[in-house]
Amino acid sequence: PDSGAEVRRLDLQINVHQPTRLQETVWTLERFFPHFAFFNSDIPAAQMYLYHTRLFPLAYGEYTIDDNGWLSGFIVDDRFDAVEYPCPQLTVMTMRNVHDTVAPKYQCVLQLEISYDGVSYLLEQEDPGEALQTLNWHLQRCDPDVILSDWGDASLMPFLRSLSDRLKIPLLLNRDPNAGYFTTKESSYFTYGKIVHKDGAFELAGRWHLDAQNSFIMDKSDFEGLFELARLTQIPVQHQARTSIGTGLSSMQHSWAYRNNVLIPANKREPEDFKPA
């Protein structure tokens, strides 16, 4: 072709008014328009909202909620990079499988140990329905802001959900009874010369579920380090707990790009190749 020929480019901006359908919409467009280059399309909706509003997790300020329960306004008296900042006093319930060596689905008797307010309770009933009812009673009594589990993502939470579905007994894991659970599939990836397995996520609505066994950040720095990273990266706390430091750094770059009207290309990641020693 003539090197001096005019190259025509078509730019389209598409807005998705229902955030929960953002990823579905992107997948549909990518399937029907494979030759298009997409930008700002693979950023999670929650992070996009925080980039757009310049809010960040645990931002201290005044928030206005309308009659429908929607956020209608806010005045933030905080900075994401503040060294000293107030943190909310969170109610924490710990939850673990008594027999960690045996996956819950293979146990004849459901045995859970939950702890809150300095007291531990053993839920051990041969009738799984009774165990779920007792768990719901403790959830209502404690009303935790955070459920801290061991192996909750991989086995405990999925098992409780399947048990709840089978017995038709609603679980009160979410504060919002109309909300579902946010789950992702387990994955394996190659990095720094080795294959790493990562459990899928099991996140809640209205309260946080943090799996101490599926969070490098919680293992090394506990709540203080998690909160600091979530504020800096603008990644919601539950998701930040399960991500790597590299993902957090990428989010900080994306936030800067979004604020400065720089388009972020989708599908940027390339598989890592072997490197010489």
Where are each of the predicted segments found?
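The two-metal-ion catalytic cores of nucleic-acid processing enzymes
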Residues: 1-277
